[in-house]
Amino acid sequence: MDLYFSPLACSLASRITVYAAGAEGSIALRQVDTKTQKTVDGADYRAINAKGMVPALRTPAGDILTENAAILPFLADQFPAANLAPAGGIERSRLAQWLSFIGSELHKTVFTPLLSPKANDGAKTYAREAATSGLAYLDAHLQGRDYLLDRFSVADAYLTAVLNWAQFVGIDLKAWPSVAAYYARVTARPHVARAMQEEMGLFQAA
């Protein structure tokens, strides 16, 4: 399999998942410059993903998957021994619920406008208001919990990648103590720390 990523983008969630699954030998990591739409070997990334965004995953069958909500559960299912996603039932639906919340209420609603130089002041103001409500909801859920579900899952990988952006937009997670404690706890996990350190190095070198 080939995983297409850009350093410190939301594709960090997929790298965390790969490392958590111990799947480095099964998945090639392909870096993408989202500004030039080229991979590091010069290939046209839009020929792989017409949307030009990361992540994208080439499956063993040669299919291309895009979007975190599709890629992360797929990766978890390829390596079931790692227990990174519930196999079915209500817990699988709860995983989908959290992936949807992270993607829509935090990633796109909060951080995309705050990180974009094209977003106007009104959009950024709305994003900060949404951050307050979204992180408050998350904080309430995480009180007394180590992870979003009963154990570390691909939803935690995605949430960690998104919360990592807070440092770049002036959001202090300490305002939400349970979120701050969660972020510190998850980023201390060896596979998460490794993924973040590697991507920070690539980001700084870009």
Annotate each language-model stretch with its function.
Residues 62, 162, 200:
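Flexible loop residues that form catalytic
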Residues 36-39, 183, 203-204:
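Generic structural signal for helix capping and beta-alpha/helix-loop junctions
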Residues 32-34, 180, 200:
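Conserved beta-strand edge residues that scaffold enzyme active sites
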Residues 1-125, 129:
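GST-like domain detector, emphasizing the conserved glutathione-binding G-site
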Residues 197-206:
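Terminal-tail/helix-coil boundary detector
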